[in-house]
């Protein structure tokens, strides 16, 4: 199986990290979640509805849509908060990345553990810029909103392609494809990881700083 890989880059101020990452992760999971499966008998099932809600950002001029699942939101906020704190405490240039990997399980014979086979990975490279004035922060608030809108549109375009998705499982195999542990939504199996690094390059950070300077010069 070929694993699809998508890479996004964002440049943000420190206080915007959490909102920007939640916007991206929630958007991807909105398109990679279904309602809960309700099996009547093997091979026959119904799918519940997936509720959505708008989220207005506090530090970015942006509104995104997420699945209205508090459990899913808490799970994402926990790992994004850890990423934010790691960036803040890195003492470096504020460079890091988060990866959202979708996978399915392949059962293995005892005593071996199940094999996790990735089929789609989203990587978001994050560059944190330091701003000196409130005027710069206001400009960054607007510019990041514009750039984030472009990223969300890109995500939706990718999701609309007719590419591989795991086939709908039978009742006995549903846990090999979906995370059934949430009460109100059923995302494809996923895991999130992050790393802090000083080797991601500075092209996006430089672009954001140039955008701010150009706007100030007007």
Curated annotation (Swiss-Prot):
Keywords: Autophagy, Cytoplasm. GO terms for molecular function: identical protein binding; protein kinase binding; protein-containing complex binding. InterPro entries: ATG101. It comes from the Eukaryota. Interacts with ATG13. Associates with a complex composed of ATG13, ULK1 and RB1CC1; the association with this complex requires the presence of ATG13. Belongs to the ATG101 family. PANTHER family: AUTOPHAGY-RELATED PROTEIN 101. This is Autophagy-related protein 101. It comes from Bos taurus (Bovine).
């Amino acid at each position: 199986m070929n694993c699809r890989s998508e890479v996004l880059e964002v440049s943000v101020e420190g206080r915007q990290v959490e909102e920007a990452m939640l916007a991206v992760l929630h958007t991807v999971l909105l398109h990679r979640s279904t309602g809960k499966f309700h099996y009547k008998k093997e091979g026959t099932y119904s799918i519940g509805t997936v509720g959505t809600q708008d989220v207005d950002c506090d530090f970015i001029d942006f509104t995104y849509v997420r699945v209205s699942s508090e459990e899913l939101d808490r799970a994402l906020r926990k790992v994004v908060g850890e990423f934010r704190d790691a960036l803040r405490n890195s003492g470096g240039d504020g460079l890091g990345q988060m990866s959202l990997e979708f996978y399915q399980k392949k059962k293995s014979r005892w005593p071996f553990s199940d094999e996790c086979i990735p089929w789609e990975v989203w990587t978001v490279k994050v560059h944190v810029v330091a701003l000196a004035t409130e005027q710069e922060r206001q400009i960054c608030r607007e510019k990041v909103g514009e750039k984030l809108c472009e990223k969300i549109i890109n995500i939706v375009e990718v999701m609309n392609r007719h590419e591989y998705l795991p086939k709908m499982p039978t009742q006995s195999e549903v846990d090999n494809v979906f995370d059934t542990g949430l009460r109100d939504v059923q995302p494809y199996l996923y895991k999130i990881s992050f790393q802090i690094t000083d080797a991601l390059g500075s092209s996006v950070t430089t672009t954001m700083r140039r955008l701010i300077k150009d706007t100030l010069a007007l």
